[in-house]
Amino acid sequence: MTNTEIFEKLTNAIVTQNIAGCVQLTQEALDAGIPPIDIITKGLSPGMKIIGDKFEAAEIFLPQIMMSAKAMSSAMEILTPELEKSKVEGEETGLAITFVAEGDIHDIGHRLVTTMLGANGFEILDLGVDVLNENVVEEAAKHKGQKVILVGSALMTTSMLGQKDLMDRLREEKLRDSLKCMFGGAPVSSKWIEEIGADATAENAAEAAKVALNIMK
């Protein structure tokens, strides 16, 4: 199989919730010498994007998302140790506080981004899913004075709206200027980021790591 064929099969395995197939193909891709980052960005992530789009359009429902997420997680169990091996050592990149917005429990994109940030030298503080804005502000306050980036994700438009409230709270608490804010997820656009006064968004996990490194310079 060519690399392109492997990527297409991986994408299809995610979309069809084929957990065993996803694991097998991920291992085959590694054995073929494909870099873990390419397996994620060209094979797995496109599958999750399709699933996210289908969910937004009400073509599929939560059980299918959970099964696709399980396929993705199973692949990441194989890939994370490989990503760790290529981790950037000795660079003081900063602290990434990662979380999924209140009312949202979709953590697959969040976990991917968290993994990629860690692999790129960030210290990670993962607050998990369905996180209240006040908890994010509290953690940001604890680390005032450090190099900090907040990285929040939301799969649903309803939970995305909470990002504006978070930005307002950070400004009220005089924390906004001391940190960077990046948000992602299917409904998040550059226009939205500009509207709420955040710093950046990214198309996928690998891009998120690059963007985060760039804005933390």
From Swiss-Prot:
Sites where the protein binds methylcob(III)alamin: H106
A GO MF term: cobalt ion binding
Domain named B12-binding: residues: 93-217
InterPro entries documented for this protein: Cbl-bd_cap, Cobalamin-bd, Cobalamin-bd_sf, Corrinoid_p, Met_Synthase/Corrinoid, Meth_synthase_dom
Gene Ontology BP terms: methanogenesis
Pfam families assigned: B12-binding, B12-binding_2
Keyword annotations from UniProtKB, A to Z: Cobalt, Metal-binding, Methanogenesis, Repeat
Domain B12-binding N-terminal: 1-91
Pathway(s) of this molecule: One-carbon metabolism; methanogenesis from methylamine
Key word Cytoplasm present: no
Tagged with keyword Repeat: yes
SUPFAM superfamilies according to UniProt: Cobalamin (vitamin B12)-binding domain (SSF52242), Methionine synthase domain (SSF47644)
Alphabetized Gene3D superfamilies for the sequence: Cobalamin-binding domain, Methionine synthase domain
Annotated function: Acts as a methyl group carrier between MtmB and MtbA.
Quaternary structure (record): Can form a complex with MtmB.
Record-stated family: Belongs to the methylamine corrinoid protein family.
Name of the molecule in the record: Monomethylamine corrinoid protein 2
Organism per entry: Methanosarcina acetivorans (strain ATCC 35395 / DSM 2834 / JCM 12185 / C2A)
Phylogenetic lineage: Archaea, Methanobacteriati, Methanobacteriota, Stenosarchaea group, Methanomicrobia
Gene name per UniProt: mtmC2
